[in-house]
Amino acid sequence: MQRVTLSLDDDLMAEIDAIIRAGNYQNRSEVIRDLARAGLQSMAQAPSPSACCVAALFYVYDHESRELSKRLTRTFHDHHDLSLASLHVHLDHGSCLEVSLLKGAGGEVTRFAERVIAERGVRHGKLVVVPGDEGVAPPHPHSHD
């Protein structure tokens, strides 16, 4: 770990100190490390097409939209190797929130998410990607039985 010196304006430091007072962090270094990681991740381009990643796909959709539920189910079944789990929440009479956890090659995960988000009736879609490292192996199509 390296030690660095930063110059920050008073307003920015006040916001960082407020985060610490809220009880989420022990010190400024922890806050700034997390902010730096988040900033680097948000500035990064799409995940490497071949590198493994994990991701969360969030989207809101109109469950009364014609055949949408069937199309989404078919899309997920066609790409079952990417899908780890899904959470379904009814927001109101007509809207549902789906959170799907995905794992696979960055290009495949991105294309899959774009396909889901592009479906007519899907709103507010967002993909959050975490690049893989040694602990994130690509899925493999055989069982361990």
UniProtKB/Swiss-Prot annotation:
Key words of the record: DNA-binding, Metal-binding, Nickel, Repressor, Transcription, Transcription regulation
Positions annotated to bind Ni(2+): H77, H88, H90, C96
Pfam families xrefs: NikR_C, RHH_1
SUPFAM superfamilies named among the record's database cross-references: ACT-like, Ribbon-helix-helix
GO molecular function term, any single one: DNA-binding transcription factor activity
One GO biological process term: response to nickel cation
InterPro entries: Acetolactate_synth/TF_NikR_C, ACT-like_dom_sf, Arc_rbn_hlx_hlx, CopG, CopG/NikR_regulator, Ni_resp_reg_NikR, Nickel_NikR_proteobac, Ribbon_hlx_hlx
Record's cofactor remark: Binds 1 nickel ion per subunit.
Obligatory cofactor(s): Ni(2+)
Domain of life according to the entry: Bacteria
Family: Belongs to the transcriptional regulatory CopG/NikR family.
Subunit details: Homotetramer.
Function of the protein: Transcriptional repressor of the nikABCDE operon. Is active in the presence of excessive concentrations of intracellular nickel.
Name of this protein: Nickel-responsive regulator
Species: Edwardsiella ictaluri (strain 93-146)
Gene from which the chain derives: nikR
